[in-house]
Amino acid sequence: MLRIATLMTYGAIALALWPAESAAAETAPDGAFFAESFDDADLAKRGWYDGTQFRIVGGARAGKGCIEYEWTDAQSKVQGSSPARHLFEPSDEVAIRFYLKLSKGWGWSGRNYHPHLTHFLTTENSKWHGPAASHLTLYVEPVGGKLRLAAQDIQNAGAPHGLTQGPLRGGYNGEFYDSDEVLFGDDRWHCVEAYFKLNTLDPKRDRPNRDGIVRGWLDGRLVVDRTNVVLRSTDFPKMKFNQFLLAPYFGPGLLPHAQKLWIDELVIGGKRIGPLPAGKGSAGEAGPRE
């Protein structure tokens, strides 16, 4: 699962501009840190960084466009759009809402890990830090058709209180929180939501309290619900979530065949956001806008 190599830094941002008449990102709902509708490729002007190209196509869940990621064959790296990051106000709780569509005949890795998709990092690492070996990385992704929420903290192996997300296993560690049932099995848009809250700490006893929260929803239905989670130790009393990373990734040899995915109507906030209002739909098909 958490075997992704430390993500390389993508130099200077060079985005192709789309004409001014394209709709800008949707205004963030109340309480949101930021929102992105992917209606045009000018993400850099909306706070995104560490990305080189963005392919915006039609057939969106809402608005004029959505972002497309493509693997052209079983051996290829992700193409069309690059990974990208967005900082937000530091917070001890974070929520995400986005719409995900997988191409017809989508294939899984055949393992209990990958693909990776969306990630959160914290103030304990830099704005350029890779997700695979951090003080805490959270994952929201579909694995084997289930919704997986996960966490790793491999960089804490040498910290005074050590790892909180399980022991090292072949160079990685992680705790997984999966839906009980397979949820992704078609080529339709689905609303993916997750909410994480850092556990509190007991400084007098020098230990974490088991009150962290991990929750996930698919199309408005609660499918993951854990309220006894430890995400940090007393080594990190000032830890906050502050960075979102969008980085679809299949490890070498894990991609079954050529396929695509699309993401739309992303919102990051401090509380659960919820699905789009009923009736807010696509603006129709269009060609790519890179």
Question: What is each of the regions a protein language model found here?
Answer:
Residues 26-49, 279-280, 287-288:
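Extracellular carbohydrate-recognition regions
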Residues 32, 91-93, 99, 177-203:
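Trp-centered recognition loops
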Residues 42-70:
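Extracellular glycan-recognition surfaces and repeat-rich motifs
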Residues 69-97, 131-133, 162-179:
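Secreted extracellular polysaccharide-interacting domains
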Residues 120-169, 174-178:
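Glycan-recognition/cleft segments
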Residues 191-230:
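Carbohydrate-binding surfaces in secreted/extracellular proteins
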Residues 208-210, 253-265, 274, 278:
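Extracellular carbohydrate recognition
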Residues 226-262:
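Flexible glycan-contacting loops in extracellular carbohydrate-active proteins
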